[in-house]
Structure formats: structure tokens, C-alpha cells
């Protein structure tokens, strides 16, 4: 692989961050190879563990440097990189405690290497399905994760003029630190068309299916902030039931039609460790998020307010 584009040879982008002084570091391939032991510290598909000096952001050794995640992403074209830089510029000026921090990047031909914070507990997606998760999270932790993610989404929606909503929102986009605080990753923005969801930034050239599509997307190919609320509702439903990929259509129908039984719907691993009223209100909130009519769904701020109220029970 060749050298990454330097700050002086980046594709034309007037406000693109070009240095560590501006908050986002432009790395070279050599830097990243050194930081990750030649990309040998694999964590998951396309992602390696690396170490850098927290002050200079130069490569460092394990035990000395700060742990970072280095993600390799294939780009459809240079325009995809230009689009990504627009998001980077916005996020440099609109940080949020529940939003994953971008440390730097490297752009080389059709590949983008993203250097971001390292999250030792991985993603929420690993903890949802009770058949495959490493451990069951207690009610309080699940609620804390939900609130953290909702805080970030409400923040992004409040900055809607920047076009940062309509994320490809899944449980794997919600990352967990050592204390299980949630941070939402914005990496991998999709381009939505009428016929399919096509990644402008993705792990392969195969277009993935929209995992949590709101009804309006299925009907028209269009979605907006209300679509985010629907997708978040699906995530809450999976967290509540522990069913993960095995979430049944009947379970969704039950909770939509208010024909749910709290004891039967909520993850049995939680047993009697949650307040029944909190469980009932969570079910009601999920039902509202999954409304077929997008106008009937709450805003993300209203979702956040409801989650905070549930946490007080």
C-alpha cells in the first residue's frame, strides 16, 4: 500500500482538518502499521488495536501509549471521502460526551483508516442476544446505555441543519467504555436511495440491508429523524427482550398492540431485578417509538426525557 495523502495533497475540501493542532491528526500508513504491529492486533472485522502517544499522537508501544481503535474502511469513490470530511469538520466543532471522538485518519487510494477511541467492552450488539452474549447486563446498566445513546442522538437531531441525522443506526454503532457508558459512532454514513441502502463508506462493495428500516423507508425509500427514533426503538426492544436477531414478528406485534405481558416480554435473565412500573413504562416508550406513522413517534429529546424519568423509579 502506498503512502497516505499528506495535508498538502488532500482532495479539495476548504475546511478539511489537516493537522493535530486543528484537532484531527492525518496519519501515514507507516504510522498506523507501527502503532498496530502491522495491523496484527485484530479486534473484529476491519479493526485493529493500536497504541499512540496521547500528547504527540505518534506511534507508541503497548503499556506506554494510549490504546486506540484503527478501522479500515473501503470507499466507493473519492466523493465518499469528501462527504466524510464534511462530517469531520462539523464534529470538530460540535463534540458531545456520548459521541465517539475521532483522533485521526489516513486516506490512501480507495481506503480510509479511522483512528478513534478504544472501547474495551466493544459494542452493545455483543450484549443483546442472550444466546451469544459474554454476560447479561443488569437493568441499571441497560438503562444507562439507553440514556447515553439517546443523549447523543438528541444532540445530533438538535443540529439537524448539518445533516448528521439519518444514521445507519444499529446496536453495533453504540460502543461501550470500561464502565459501560455508551458512545455513539458516526462512522459509516450510508447513502439512501429508493431501491437499496448503499454504503458510501462500508466494509465491502456489497450493499448491506437496512437492518432496522422504518415503515416509511420501505414504502418510499425516504427517512428522516423520525426514522432514527424507530431504529432506536428496535434497539430498546432488543435490549428489553434479549432476543437479538431472534426477535420475532409476534413479539413486535404484541408490544405495538399493547398485548404484551411484562414478565414474558422482558429478558428472563433480569428476573425480578427491575421495578415493574419501570418495565411497563419502557414497553410503552418502545411502542411509541415503533409507531407506523412517523408523526406519532416521539422526538429523540422526548425519548430521552422518558428514559430519565424511568431511571428515577
From Swiss-Prot:
Pfam families: PK_Tyr_Ser-Thr (PF07714)
PTM annotation, UniProt: N-terminal myristoylation is critical for plasma membrane localization and implication in defense responses. Autophosphorylated.
GO biological process: defense response; immune response-activating signaling pathway; positive regulation of defense response to bacterium; protein autophosphorylation
Keyword Hydrolase belongs to the record: no
Name of the protein in its database record: Serine/threonine-protein kinase SZE1
Tissues where this protein is expressed: Expressed in roots, seedlings, rosette leaves, floral organs, siliques and inflorescence stems.
Keyword set, alphabetical order: ATP-binding, Cell membrane, Kinase, Lipoprotein, Membrane, Myristate, Nucleotide-binding, Phosphoprotein, Plant defense, Transferase
Reactions accelerated catalytically: L-seryl-[protein] + ATP = O-phospho-L-seryl-[protein] + ADP + H(+); L-threonyl-[protein] + ATP = O-phospho-L-threonyl-[protein] + ADP + H(+)
Membrane disposition: Lipid-anchor
Family of the protein in this entry: Belongs to the protein kinase superfamily. Ser/Thr protein kinase family.
Cellular compartment(s): Cell membrane
UniProt-listed PROSITE patterns: PROTEIN_KINASE_DOM
Chain's role: Together with BKN2/SZE2 and ZED1, required for effector-triggered immunity (e.g. Pseudomonas syringae effector type III HopZ1a) via the activation of ZAR1, thus being essential for resistance against P.syringae pv. tomato DC3000 expressing HopZ1a.
GO CC, any one term: nucleus
Gene Ontology molecular function: ATP binding; protein kinase activity
Gene: SZE1
Domain spans labelled Protein kinase: 43-311
Complexes and interactors: Component of an immune signaling complex made of, at least, SZE1, BKN2/SZE2, ZAR1 and ZED1. Interacts directly with ZED1, ZAR1 and Pseudomonas syringae HOPZ1A at the plasma membrane.
Residues holding ATP: 49-57, 71
InterPro entries listed in its UniProt record: Kinase-like_dom_sf, Plant_Ser_Thr_Prot_Kinase, Prot_kinase_dom, Ser-Thr/Tyr_kinase_cat_dom
Entry EC no(s): 2.7.11.1
Lipidation (N-myristoyl glycine): 2
Domain of life: Eukaryota
Knocked-out gene: effects: Partial suppression of the pleiotropic phenotypes conferred by the dominant mutation zed1-D (e.g. high-temperature-dependent growth retardation and autoimmunity).
Amino acid at each position: 500500500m502506498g503512502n497516505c495523502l499528506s495535508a498538502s495533497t488532500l482532495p479539495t475540501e476548504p475546511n478539511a482538518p489537516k493537522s493535530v493542532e486543528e484537532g484531527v491528526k492525518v496519519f501515514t500508513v507507516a504510522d498506523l502499521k507501527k502503532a498496530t504491529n502491522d495491523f496484527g492486533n485484530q479486534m473484529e472485522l476491519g479493526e485493529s488495536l493500536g497504541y499512540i502517544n496521547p500528547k504527540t499522537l505518534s506511534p507508541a508501544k503497548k503499556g506506554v501509549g494510549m490504546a486506540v481503535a484503527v478501522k479500515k474502511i473501503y470507499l466507493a469513490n473519492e466523493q465518499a471521502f469528501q462527504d466524510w470530511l464534511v462530517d469531520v469538520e462539523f464534529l470538530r466543532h460540535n463534540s458531545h460526551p456520548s459521541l465517539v471522538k475521532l483522533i485521526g485518519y489516513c486516506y490512501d487510494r480507495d481506503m480510509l483508516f479511522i483512528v478513534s477511541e478504544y472501547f474495551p467492552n466493544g459494542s452493545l450488539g455483543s450484549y443483546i442476544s442472550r444466546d451469544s452474549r459474554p454476560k447479561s447486563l443488569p437493568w441499571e446498566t441497560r438503562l444507562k446505555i439507553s440514556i447515553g445513546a439517546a443523549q447523543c442522538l438528541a444532540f445530533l437531531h438538535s443540529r439537524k441543519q448539518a445533516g448528521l441525522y439519518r444514521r445507519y443506526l444499529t446496536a453495533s454503532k453504540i460502543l461501550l467504555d470500561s464502565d459501560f457508558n455508551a458512545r455513539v459512532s458516526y462512522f459509516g454514513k450510508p447513502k439512501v436511495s429508493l431501491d437499496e441502502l448503499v454504503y458510501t463508506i462500508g466494509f465491502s462493495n456489497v450493499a448491506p440491508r437496512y437492518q432496522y428500516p422504518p415503515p416509511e423507508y420501505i414504502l418510499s425509500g425516504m427517512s428522516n429523524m423520525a426514522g432514527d427514533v424507530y431504529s432506536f426503538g428496535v434497539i430498546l426492544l432488543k435490549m428489553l427482550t434479549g432476543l437479538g436477531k431472534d426477535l420475532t414478528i409476534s413479539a413486535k406485534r404484541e408490544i405495538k398492540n399493547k398485548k404484551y405481558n411484562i414478565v414474558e416480554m422482558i429478558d428472563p435473565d433480569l428476573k425480578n431485578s427491575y421495578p415493574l412500573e419501570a418495565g411497563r413504562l419502557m414497553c410503552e416508550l418502545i411502542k411509541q417509538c415503533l409507531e407506523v406513522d412517523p408523526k406519532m413517534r416521539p422526538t429523540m429529546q422526548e425519548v430521552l426525557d422518558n428514559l430519565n424519568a424511568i431511571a428515577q423509579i
